[in-house]
């Protein structure tokens, strides 16, 4: 089930389980995971796969970590309008929702990839390494933002 509201997400998610964060890309998919308390988001891995293989790998991760919900970053232009990538992410999210039967929250991810890259640059991470891990760091930034919104929501407690 695709969800666009944090309140609906909190009602649908199994909050006793970890949450997965995803930064979708055509070539790479970054994956992050929360701790069980939903206070920290940690980069987990980068998936280098296409089409159905991405879905299958995410399903394997969801089963292995007993995931209760998923957060996927939804890209928009800075002015809030949709892009062709926005539509690709929505299509991916729908396919994932049909396969996993978990609540999926689509959240605004404007500037998260840039933030991830800047964070890695500040850590003096070499470009080749940055390119290999920037998507999973972006996924953790996306997930971290949602975790903060969850903690700030009165319905979470």
Curated annotation (Swiss-Prot):
Which biological processes are named by the entry's GO terms?
Answer: rRNA 5'-end processing
Any one GO molecular-function label of the UniProt entry: nuclease activity
InterPro entries in the cross-refs:
RNaseH-like_sf (IPR012337), YqgF (IPR005227), YqgF/RNaseH-like_dom (IPR006641), YqgF/RNaseH-like_dom_sf (IPR037027)
Instruction: List localization entries.
Output: Cytoplasm
Q: What is an example of a Pfam family matching this protein?
A: RuvX
Q: Which SMART domains match?
A: YqgFc (SM00732)
Q: Which Gene3D superfamilies match?
A: YqgF/RNase H-like domain (3.30.420.140)
GO CC aspect terms: cytosol
Specify whether Transmembrane is a keyword of the entry.
Answer: no
**In the Enzyme Commission scheme, what number(s) does this protein have?**
3.1.-.-
Instruction: Indicate yes or no for the key word rRNA-binding.
Output: no
Locate the coiled-coil region(s) and give their ranges.
none
Name under which the protein is recorded: Putative pre-16S rRNA nuclease
